[in-house]
Amino acid sequence: MQPEDFAYLSELESDFWWFVGMREITAALLDPVCAPRIDRQVLDDGSGTGGNLSWLKRYAGNGEVAGIDVTAEALSFCKKQGHQLLVQASATDLPFPESRFDLVTSFDVLVQIPEVGSDESAISEIFRVLKPGGIAFVRGAAYEWLKSDHDAALATHHRYSLEELVGKMKAAGFEILRSTYANSFLLPVALVRRLVLKRIGLARGSDVKPMPSALRWVNAPLTAALRAEAAWLRRGETKLGFGLSAICLARKP
């Protein structure tokens, strides 16, 4: 990622439709298996600029939320928000003992690991640091054929099918609780933005950037679209059959 991308992310994470809506979807899946308790230990594996660290405190109660990221620049934004339990480290080599955490989240981190097979190492590390019965929430960008300049700008090296992500979680030893695509309503928009416009040179760079003032009105309806998906996913064992993100919720036996 470029330095300006970290600044954009930090600016947008609190109220930009994608971040707000995807947190709603995360809650829809996590809430049934992470009931409030007073001492849950939580790790955000690849915390970026820290937008999810404060949000994850809802699952920690009086416990702790730790964050790791491979880049010092990203962690500097976390520190500016007052977060202290931060470590600069790779997702493929977590600096924690076995069975340390009750919940580990990985938001679009596996897709940024460049070495072939290293995503499997990262999943194995999540398994290692979780306590028996601990929960893993793993999300990654979906569909390799949807790669675009947005992925290059955000250092996304691979996009997953849901079947591939679930298969790798199972291979690491996880019990799969839920799996689904997400950001489904907006897949047609992404197809136009990233594939059609790209071919005629009108779609370049990352989609993560401040919204022009003339278009800020779309933030609310786009947020509402993702909230509608979250409401659907709260209905028992429902899932979405396609979307821009692949999600796997799993438990360490």
Label the model's feature ranges.
Residues A225-P253:
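C-terminal lobe and adjacent flexible extensions of AdoMet/dcAdoMet transferase-like proteins
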Residues V166-A182, A224, A228, R251:
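A SAM-dependent methyltransferase catalytic signature shared across enzymes that methylate proteins
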Residues A136-H158, E164-G167:
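Short, glycine-/aromatic-enriched active-site segment of Class I SAM-dependent methyltransferases
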Residues L103-G117:
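A short SAM/SAH-binding and catalytic strip from SAM-dependent methyltransferases
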Residues M1-P97, L103-F107, I123, G243-A246:
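Conserved N-terminal segment of class I S-adenosyl-L-methionine
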Residues G51, E73, P114-S118, S148:
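Short N-terminal helix/helix-N-cap motif within the alpha/beta-hydrolase-1
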Residues G51, R178-R227, G241-S245:
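Conserved catalytic loop of SAM-dependent methyltransferase domains
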Residues E120-I135:
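A short glycine-rich, Lys/Arg-flanked "PGG" loop and its adjoining helix->strand segment in the class I
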